[in-house]
């Protein structure tokens, strides 16, 4: 579809509405299942340090499958790829429901999620264009965060009420997501005709990695989103252990409600980014990234529920404002160089490598007995410094460009 035709279409086209609905149900299932499965492994008396291992098994599938999922997203109609991926998530949820190993079941959900991600973001570049793409990303993030908000809370509350009911609801929601994908119009494959031999696919993927990491703008986007999502998933697990220590509450619902506050904030931040940031002014998001680390440090020292809610909403606002423009930048640049699906697969590799590293470090310090408040403070300080270094590095790169003779 030509860029002129896309520019003339309304943002909330039939295609866009179908994608947003499918994404909502899929993300709802992901988040409800995470907290229901965490409740299950607590009930089965797994040690505290095993909780991040659950997420590490999930993100490891992204890393292993990274060379293949981008080409799959670009080689087939993306709506159908999303449908099959949601079917794999449904299968993983059923594995857990039927009492098999929860780590195995959640890893199968990870396989579906790894295949789903390049397709869901890559399709945005096929149904929107130009500055609409930033707004489309904002709407995608809003849909995702609304699902995180409702799914996380539903998973925690249902798990406190009846654990098997919580797991059954997760499977049902994935089934609805599969059906919702049928309403996404079938679009032509973005890049058909590529080799499907694993060796050729791996070589093609690492060529895409090299091209994206060599370009200063896409490298900036990849580094920023990797740091953000690595920190975000670690914060989720930090909250599970922080709540009993700081607030004296030992249920499953409170950590999910606190995670929901971050989700509410991200919706607001994503909307602000769509309003105030364009592809030409992406660097406006960097101060928000530094402030995320500052706010996490302040949050870790709280013992008041109202202040915890307020600070997590602020963290979410800053997070939405930070990550949405970076996603849009990568999709726009990647679409014209390596294909949107490959670009998102490379992004997923970076983000999930960061998640695996941060979760592994977090699991280690918890196993070593570090106080959870001290872990939170250190985590916030390190994140703020990392984004500040990224900001300084990007500023230096820009200065070098302006000094080069034309």
Swiss-Prot record:
Entries under InterPro entries matching the protein: LysoPLipid__transptr_LplT, MFS, MFS_trans_sf
Subcellular location, record wording: Cell inner membrane
Keyword rRNA processing: no
SUPFAM superfamilies recorded: MFS general substrate transporter (SSF103473)
Topology class, membrane: Multi-pass membrane protein
Recorded superkingdom: Bacteria
Keyword line: Cell inner membrane, Cell membrane, Lipid transport, Membrane, Transmembrane, Transmembrane helix, Transport
Residues that span the membrane, as ranges: 16-36, 53-73, 91-111, 139-159, 164-184, 227-247, 253-273, 285-305, 310-330, 349-369, 372-392
GO cellular component, as recorded: plasma membrane
GO molecular function: lysophospholipid:sodium symporter activity
Its job: Catalyzes the facilitated diffusion of 2-acyl-glycero-3-phosphoethanolamine (2-acyl-GPE) into the cell.
Family listed: Belongs to the major facilitator superfamily. LplT (TC 2.A.1.42) family.
Name of the molecule in the record: Lysophospholipid transporter LplT
Gene: lplT
């Amino acid at each position: 579809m030509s860029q002129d035709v896309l520019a003339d279409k309304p943002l909330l086209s039939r295609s866009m509405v179908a994608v947003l609905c499918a994404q909502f149900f899929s993300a709802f299932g992901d988040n409800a299942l995470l907290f229901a499965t965490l409740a299950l492994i607590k009930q089965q008396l797994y040690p505290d340090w095993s909780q991040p291992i659950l997420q590490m098994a999930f993100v490891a599938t992204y890393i292993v499958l990274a060379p293949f999922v981008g080409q799959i997203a670009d080689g087939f109609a993306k709506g159908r790829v999303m449908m099959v991926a949601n079917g794999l998530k449904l299968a993983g949820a059923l594995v857990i429901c039927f009492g098999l190993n929860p780590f195995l079941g959640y890893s199968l959900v990870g396989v579906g999620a790894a295949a789903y991600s390049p397709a869901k973001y890559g399709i945005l570049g096929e149904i929107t264009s130009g500055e609409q793409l930033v707004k489309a990303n904002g709407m995608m993030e809003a849909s995702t965060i609304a699902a995180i908000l409702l799914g996380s809370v539903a998973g925690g509350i249902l798990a406190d009420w009846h654990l098997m009911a919580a797991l059954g609801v997760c499977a049902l929601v994935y089934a609805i997501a599969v059906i919702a994908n049928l309403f996404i119009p079938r679009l032509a494959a973005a890049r058909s005709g590529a080799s499907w031999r694993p060796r050729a696919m791996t070589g093609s993927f690492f060529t895409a990695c090299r091209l994206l990491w060599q370009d200063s703008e896409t490298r900036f986007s990849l580094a920023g989103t990797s740091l953000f999502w690595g920190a975000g998933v670690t914060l989720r697990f930090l909250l599970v252990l922080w709540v009993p220590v700081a607030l004296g509450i030992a249920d499953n619902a409170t950590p999910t409600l606190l995670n929901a506050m971050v989700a509410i904030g991200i919706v607001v931040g994503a909307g602000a980014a769509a309003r105030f940031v364009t592809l030409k002014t992406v660097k406006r998001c960097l101060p928000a990234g530094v402030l995320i680390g500052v706010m996490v440090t302040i949050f870790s020292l709280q013992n008041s529920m109202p202040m915890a809610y307020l600070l997590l909403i602020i963290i979410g606002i800053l997070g939405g404002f930070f990550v949405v423009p970076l996603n849009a930048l990568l999709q726009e640049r990647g679409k014209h160089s390596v294909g949107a699906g490959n670009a998102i697969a490379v992004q997923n590799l970076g983000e999930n490598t960061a998640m695996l590293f941060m979760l592994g470090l977090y699991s280690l310090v918890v196993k070593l007995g570090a106080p959870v408040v001290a872990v939170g403070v250190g985590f916030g300080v390190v994140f703020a410094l990392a984004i500040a270094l990224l900001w300084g590095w990007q500023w230096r790169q820009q200065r070098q460009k302006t000094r080069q003779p034309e």
